[in-house]
Amino acid sequence: MKFNFITLFPEKIKSYYSEGLPGKAIDNKVVDLEILQLRDYSNNKHFKIDDTIYGGGAGMLLKVEPIDLALEYLGESKGTVILLTPSGKTFTQSIAKDLADKRNNITFISGYYEGVDHRVTENLIDVELSLGNYVISSGDLAALCVSDAILRLIPGFLGDFEGSLKDESHNEEGILEYPQYTKPAEYKGWKVPDILLSGNHSEIQKWKEANRKKLPQ
């Protein structure tokens, strides 16, 4: 499985995937990584990848041609093509699991400025995804969030800790984990619930189930 990123800021992607668990996943070939600088696929002598909007409108749009040429370069290895945009379908854990289970290559296209030429959406991608009902300055942030959520569900990512996914802090049903505590048992009068200190595993399990929370819809 391979993650491809089409971006204006390759160093952001490289930096994220060179550290911590994502970096180890790349080193251990859990997934392969390819990062394309979008400007490399511009036919403009100034490497221009955006332009003004037909019909008027504020801001600039990413042009269709550089994105198309980048995808042509990837060829069959592009796999599922995802455009990160505020207008896309809201990304969820169940979508992450579905994409991880398919084991297909994934290409992430980061949006910037006012977005992309709509011909990209109509002809070149498989799905638009959004982190939520808000706008951020760079699609790279969204691409990293989505790719990380998918990556951590791929076997081998957590190594010896794979079993912890069964007790995950958030699963595809939208259930959050129960409250968790560590030492000390009391701090500034704030106490860990007595049941968690009791050693009664069956009662502790009941407490955990009773205190799981549902994500707001």
Where are these regions (language model features)?
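Short, solvent-exposed amphipathic alpha-helical segments in soluble enzyme
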Residues: 20-24, 97-101, 123-124
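N-terminal nucleotide/polyanion-binding subdomain common to many enzyme families
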Residues: 1-74, 197, 202-217
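Short glycine-enriched loops at secondary-structure junctions
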Residues: 38-41, 112-116
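Hydrophobic/aromatic beta-strand patches that form the interior of the parallel beta-sheet core
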Residues: 4-6, 34-36, 80-82, 106-107, ...
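Structured adenosyl-cofactor binding patch, chiefly the S-adenosyl-L-methionine
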Residues: 116, 120-163, 170
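S-adenosyl-L-methionine/SAH cofactor-binding core of RNA-modifying enzymes
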Residues: 61-112, 118
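A short acidic, often aromatic-flanked loop/helix-cap motif at beta-alpha or helix-coil junctions
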Residues: 39-44, 89, 135-138
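Long, charged alpha-helical interface segments
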Residues: 169-217
